[in-house]
């Protein structure tokens, strides 16, 4: 084959009793994906230096693993940093959403999610408990809302799906009728509070 199996799920299916998530992968499985991929990248001459150890590192709740390295496309090209991130298939749509569009759009979409009772990050969309303080961290052990596609995240939030090429800033976070979320009374109040906190 051309390298590691891009879906290591089959090897982990039976060992997922501890997880209530719809994705049975553990941090060890994510690490295994990276362990299979790195030798292929090194042998091709693409990966020229590792910045993290073989297993990479994950976030504290084990929702993904990251490996950082230095790559080079050819002998006469500049070196570039690469982050290889392995996410569970159950939350890949949130990871894709997080890494497309502008940082400003993502920041305001995440803030809109908070105003609507959700927590949105690259690790998934999570329904927050009632009366959860807007600025408080996401409670541990929340299962992500099932959103197989980016569009499902927008639908769950009651927002209009925005194509990645149109994700520029807060004016692109839209209600179903096309009205910018942040031009509404609730959105404007939340935006003012968020902007004050950023200063």
Residue ranges of predicted features:
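Acidic, metal-coordinating catalytic segment for phosphate/diphosphate chemistry
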Residues: 3-11, 15-198
């Amino acid at each position: 084959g051309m390298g590691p199996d891009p879906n290591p799920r089959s090897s982990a299916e039976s060992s997922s009793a501890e997880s209530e998530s719809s994705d049975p992968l553990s941090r060890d499985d994510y690490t295994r994906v990276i362990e299979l991929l790195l030798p292929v990248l090194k042998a091709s001459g693409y990966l020229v230096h590792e910045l993290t150890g073989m297993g990479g590192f994950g976030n504290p709740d084990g929702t993904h693993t990251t490996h950082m390295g230095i790559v080079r496309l050819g002998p006469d090209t500049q070196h570039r940093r690469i982050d290889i991130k392995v996410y569970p298939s159950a939350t890949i749509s949130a990871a894709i959403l997080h890494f497309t569009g502008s940082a400003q759009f993502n920041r305001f979409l995440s803030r809109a999610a908070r105003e609507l009772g959700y927590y949105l990050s690259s690790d998934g969309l999570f329904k927050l408990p009632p009366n959860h303080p807007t600025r408080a961290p996401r409670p541990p052990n929340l299962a992500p809302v099932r959103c197989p596609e980016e569009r499902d995240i927008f639908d769950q939030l009651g927002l209009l799906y925005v194509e990645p090429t149109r994700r520029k800033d807060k004016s692109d976070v839209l209600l179903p009728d096309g009205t910018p979320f942040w031009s509404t009374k609730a959105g404007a109040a939340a935006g003012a509070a968020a902007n004050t906190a950023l200063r």
